[in-house]
């Protein structure tokens, strides 16, 4: 059966990507990044020596503070007792409960000392202590309360979120830049966009679909080896495992499952927007401008003080570049509650609204450009036949 012009063109776009050595090299490099912490063990602090050192430190503090007020000595005795329970219960089913009790005790002591003016803590630090206590309390309530102390033992869901938020965000957009560069090269060599048997809107749609699906496929293929290894060796994991983080003066609590879904949603939205911008530029024969625009957008978050002064604060949540680093929205899994600077009002819902709005704006601009190109072609034909 003879294929239509759009179908043949879409097939050509796909064939160009599959046959490109650069695409496979980038995909392989991303696969190595995904599997890095399966090969190189990252310890998270859940080892008995860590808590034994903390206990020794408290004992030394008790000796130094032997003449301190009674309430200080009582606080140190309580902390020492809780730490001793943690050390004694290490490796048993009571370990999670002991950890939760210890961190709750620390959070309450610090909160009281802060209210009484005995410690110089920031509001975020107080929230961080409270978040740590809640994190361990939530873990203790799980059906299987475990602490992941070694990256080589992370289950699939936890490892995936850990790697997605630990590695530089721009790594996941490199395939798009490479594929866009390949299409630009093909256009300049008169192999791709010359005598295209499709209309301008169909051309944009085909280019968008090719850029978006190929880039997404590269990331998925790169993820698969590490995903299969962790699934077979460490299991799927508990999607309800907690993730806590502090941002904009608020304490946020998510599960690993929720955080993964939010990361994927923001990433897919950003990738779609960048692919759309690139497709429109390519269709208008300004491919190099497309590549420059994508690179500049990815580079914006690296501007010094991007979130704290360089860009007006009220504009941040309306810029898609603000949400490129998905970890600012999902938090970073681990035994410590992270303090994340994400910009005022830069939440998941705000990010999805901003990305959707920009996608709609680019589509409208593309329609206007297509209409203008159509009118110019009609005018040129009329002049030729005049």
Question: Residue ranges of each PLM-predicted region?
Answer:
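Transmembrane helix segments
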Residues: 41, 282-319
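Short helix-to-coil transition segments within interhelical loops
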Residues: 194-201
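Alpha-helical transmembrane segments of multi-pass membrane transporters/translocases
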Residues: 22-38, 274, 331-386
């Amino acid at each position: 059966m003879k294929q239509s012009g759009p179908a043949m063109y879409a097939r050509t776009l796909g064939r160009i990507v599959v046959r490109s050595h650069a695409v496979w090299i980038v995909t392989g490099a991303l696969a190595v990044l995904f599997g890095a912490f399966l090969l190189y063990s990252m310890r998270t602090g859940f080892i008995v020596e860590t808590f034994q050192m903390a206990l020794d430190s408290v004992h030394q503090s008790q000796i130094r503070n032997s003449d301190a007020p009674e309430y200080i000595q009582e606080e140190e005795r309580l902390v020492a007792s809780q730490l001793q329970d943690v050390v004694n219960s290490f490796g048993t089913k009571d370990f999670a409960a002991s950890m939760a009790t210890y961190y709750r005790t620390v959070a309450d002591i610090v909160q009281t000392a802060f209210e009484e003016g005995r410690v110089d803590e920031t509001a975020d630090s107080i929230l961080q202590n409270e978040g740590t206590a809640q994190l361990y309390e939530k873990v203790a309530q799980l059906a299987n309360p475990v602490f992941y102390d070694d990256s080589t033992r992370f289950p699939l869901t936890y490892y995936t979120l850990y790697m997605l938020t630990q590695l530089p965000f721009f790594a996941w957009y490199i395939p798009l830049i490479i594929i866009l560069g390949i299409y630009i090269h093909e256009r300049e060599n008169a192999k791709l966009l010359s005598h295209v048997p499709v209309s301008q809107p169909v051309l944009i749609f085909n280019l968008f679909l090719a850029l978006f699906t190929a880039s997404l496929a590269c990331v998925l293929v790169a993820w698969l080896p590490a995903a299969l290894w962790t699934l077979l060796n460490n299991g799927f994991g508990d999607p309800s495992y907690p993730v806590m983080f502090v941002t904009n003066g608020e304490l946020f609590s998510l599960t690993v499952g929720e955080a993964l879904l939010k990361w994927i949603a923001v990433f897919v939205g950003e990738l779609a927007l960048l692919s759309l911008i690139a497709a429109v530029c390519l269709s208008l024969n300004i491919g190099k401008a497309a590549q420059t625009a994508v690179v500049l957008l990815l580079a914006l978050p690296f501007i010094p003080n991007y979130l704290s002064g360089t860009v007006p604060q009220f504009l941040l949540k309306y810029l898609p570049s603000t949400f490129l680093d998905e970890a600012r929205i999902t938090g970073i899994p681990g035994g410590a509650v992270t303090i994340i600077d994400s910009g005022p009002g830069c939440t998941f819902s705000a990010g999805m609204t901003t990305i959707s709005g920009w996608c709609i704006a680019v589509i409208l601009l593309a329609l206007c450009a297509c209409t203008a190109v159509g009118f110019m072609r009609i005018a040129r034909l009329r002049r030729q036949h005049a």
